[in-house]
Amino acid sequence: MNIQAILSEKVSQALIAAGAPADSEAHIRQSAKAQFGDYQANGVMAAAKKVGMPPRQLAEKVVNLLNLQGIASKVEIAGPGFINIFLDKAWIAANIETALKDEKLGVTPAKPQTIVVDYSAPNVAKQMHVGHLRSTIIGDAAVRTLEFLGHKVIRANHVGDWGTQFGMLIAYLEKVQNENASDMALSDLEAFYREAKKHYDEDEEFAIRARGYVVKLQGGDEYCRTMWRKLVDITMAQNQQTYDRLNVTLTKDSVMGESLYNDLLPSIVADLKQQGLAVESDGATVVYLDEYKNKEGEPMGVIIQKQDGGYLYTTTDIACAKYRYETLHADRILYYIDSRQHQHLMQAWTIVRKAGYVPESVSLEHHMFGMMLGKDSKPFKTRAGGTVRLTDLLDEAIERANTLIREKNPDMPEDELKKVVSAVGIGAVKYADLSKSRTTDYIFDWDNMLAFEGNTAPYMQYAYTRVASIFKRAEIDESSLTLPVILNEDREQTLATRLLQFEETITTVAREGTPHVMCAYLYDLAGLFSCFYEHCQILNAESEELRQSRLKLALLTAKTLKQGLNTLGIETVERM
């Protein structure tokens, strides 16, 4: 149930009935302070301006026409024309009951769409590094959220599995006569990559041979294809181990690398020429875009085919968007790629729209993100200044969590300890990232992310175990809770109202790709429960009716925390 949507519809109807234009919006917001009610309608001022009426006068007309019977106990006008809405206790209680009986916690399924989510995108023959973390975990949180709401989600891991580097690798592997590539570890491949690059830069004969292998590979040469496939398979097998450790839902079936679009590129270039969008310029094929200007103020030229016949990332991205609409039948396409790629993507999509490959009805969205920084506010590096491998980062997270949990639970059985350490260590790394707005850079800090205070994974995981332990300790089965929810105390009502705002939260995350909104909601919910727990007796409540009612609030809190963390890919544990 989406309270915001319900109130928005009701207030908008009243606004229009009061004489406001048909496109008037209620602008319903959760109230910042209890004195302003549970929700506030802020749309009257804008509507009043359009109809030339004093805002307060329009607000009075709206309130008189507003039918919130059974939903609100009180509606007030404040200031110049704000409408404060106080929800009815009985209505809140009834909806808590409904949410408890529903495996989706009262969340209304969305109208299903086919949504392609492009995320992670590591490169072949290279180990994943911290630069891949944000795309991987933010994208996966989006996928989990969209699937929870009932959408058909297609995971697209746009792996860098094509290009000049494969000519270099194949040429160098041949040079050292190591054709049995499948026996190599990925660390060996990285060493090969460095050596191949060195030879490519310093040995012109080697570079010519490498470029020749690229042509052969693109032409379908069997030997080159076999070597290429081995390199891809070794890389993705290693990456899958990282995905599994991260509790990320990507699999081998999610791989849709650059190579997938190779066969589409010639026809796309030909079609863009035929449509008059692309022209020849100094032997290359270029699309000039009026929307983007160069330094001279002239339309910017976007190259889609080089003089030597080679294609560029833009060409692949055009083909990629076309494929996702025409073949995958996407209604919405989300890209979790860092902010530095924004102009590149916008140019590719401008061409896609002009060519008619993807209609305006299909949303193309770049959910960009900032960088992960060290405490010095510079890009996160090793002490030696090198790139931090993702496996090394996760190893350190486990090591630090192990020390932390052992100190708190010296007698915990080893098998249980291992599960808790993994959940806390990996969860801490993920939550530290997901709890920050994805559009900004953030500081990576071990001490903060592993703290049991503040908006951290350990705090949230502990908050869940604390609530769940109430039922475990008292050996209470939820089926025994047969009495209705009653809300006598303010803290009970505040907690109950916040619980009912889960759908508003998850809908926002799905619409905007902002998992930090879910983190903020869960953190606030945990704080409200803590306040409720300290001031309202649960197991020793003064009556059985009150005891069961408060247990129901605790139960829905536990379920909401668990489900919310699950949409973020954060595991919960029963004991910490």
UniProtKB/Swiss-Prot annotation:
Keyword Transcription belongs to the record: no
Keywords, comma-separated and alphabetical: Aminoacyl-tRNA synthetase, ATP-binding, Cytoplasm, Ligase, Nucleotide-binding, Protein biosynthesis
Principal location listed in the UniProt entry: cytoplasm
Pfam families: Arg_tRNA_synt_N, DALR_1, tRNA-synt_1d
Reactions mediated catalytically: tRNA(Arg) + L-arginine + ATP = L-arginyl-tRNA(Arg) + AMP + diphosphate
Family according to the record: Belongs to the class-I aminoacyl-tRNA synthetase family.
PANTHER family reported in the protein's UniProt record: ARGININE--TRNA LIGASE, CYTOPLASMIC (PTHR11956:SF5), ARGINYL-TRNA SYNTHETASE (PTHR11956)
Protein name in UniProt: Arginine--tRNA ligase
Organism name: Photorhabdus laumondii subsp. laumondii (strain DSM 15139 / CIP 105565 / TT01) (Photorhabdus luminescens subsp. laumondii)
